[in-house]
C-alpha cells in the first residue's frame, strides 16, 4: 500500500515521503496513529496544501522535546526495592517503574519511551539509560536503585 507520511517514522521516512508498506502495517498502526494517510490523488493534493502547517507542527514538537531533554539530561532518579544480601533485587525494575519515578520527579514520560537495552534492572546500583522523547531526541538519565 502506498502511503504519505504525516510525521517522521523511524526506519521508514520523513514528513511528506510517499512510501510503500505492507497493508496490515498501514491499516493497523500507521493510519490509526495518524502517522500516515493513503496516497490517493486527493490525499496528495490535501497534503501539499497543508504541508507548511504540518512542517511547523513537527518543528514545534521537536523544539518542545529538545527543551524537555535539556532539562532532563543528567537527572538521577532513585527507585527503592527490596533486595537480598548480595545486592540482587527481589523482582526487577522495568520501564513502567522508571516512568513512574520520572513522573514523580516532574517529567511526563510514556513507559515505551524508556530505552532499556539489557532488559529490566535486577541489581542495586546506578544505571545510565536513555529516554526517547522524540524520534530525533534522546535524554540521558541515571537510575539509582537502592535497597529498602
Curated annotation (Swiss-Prot):
The lineage of its organism: Bacteria, Pseudomonadati, Pseudomonadota, Betaproteobacteria, Rhodocyclales. Pfam families: Ribosomal_L9_C, Ribosomal_L9_N. HAMAP family: Ribosomal_bL9 (MF_00503). It comes from the Bacteria. This is Large ribosomal subunit protein bL9. GO terms for molecular function: rRNA binding; structural constituent of ribosome. Belongs to the bacterial ribosomal protein bL9 family. Signal peptide: none annotated. Binds to the 23S rRNA. NCBIfam families: L9. Keywords: Ribonucleoprotein, Ribosomal protein, RNA-binding, rRNA-binding. The gene is rplI. PROSITE patterns: RIBOSOMAL_L9 (PS00651). GO terms for cellular component: ribonucleoprotein complex; ribosome. It comes from Dechloromonas aromatica (strain RCB). GO terms for biological process: translation. InterPro entries: Ribosomal_bL9 (IPR000244), Ribosomal_bL9/RNase_H1_N (IPR009027), Ribosomal_bL9_bac/chp (IPR020594), Ribosomal_bL9_C (IPR020069), Ribosomal_bL9_C_sf (IPR036791), Ribosomal_bL9_N (IPR020070), Ribosomal_bL9_N_sf (IPR036935).
Amino acid at each position: 500500500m502506498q502511503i504519505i507520511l504525516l510525521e517522521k517514522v523511524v526506519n521508514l521516512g520523513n514528513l511528506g515521503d510517499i512510501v510503500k508498506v505492507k497493508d496490515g502495517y498501514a491499516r493497523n498502526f500507521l493510519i490509526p496513529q495518524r502517522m500516515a494517510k493513503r496516497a490517493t490523488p486527493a490525499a496528495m493534493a490535501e497534503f501539499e496544501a497543508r504541508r507548511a502547517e504540518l512542517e511547523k507542527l513537527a518543528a514545534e514538537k521537536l523544539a518542545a522535546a529538545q527543551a524537555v531533554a535539556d532539562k532532563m539530561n543528567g537527572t538521577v532518579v532513585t527507585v527503592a526495592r527490596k533486595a537480598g544480601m548480595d545486592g540482587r533485587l527481589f523482582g526487577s525494575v522495568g520501564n513502567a517503574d522508571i516512568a513512574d519515578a520520572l513522573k514523580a520527579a516532574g517529567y511526563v514520560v510514556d513507559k515505551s519511551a524508556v530505552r532499556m537495552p539489557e532488559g529490566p534492572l535486577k541489581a542495586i546500583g546506578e544505571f545510565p539509560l536513555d529516554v526517547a522523547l522524540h524520534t530525533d531526541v534522546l535524554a540521558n538519565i541515571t537510575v539509582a536503585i537502592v535497597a529498602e
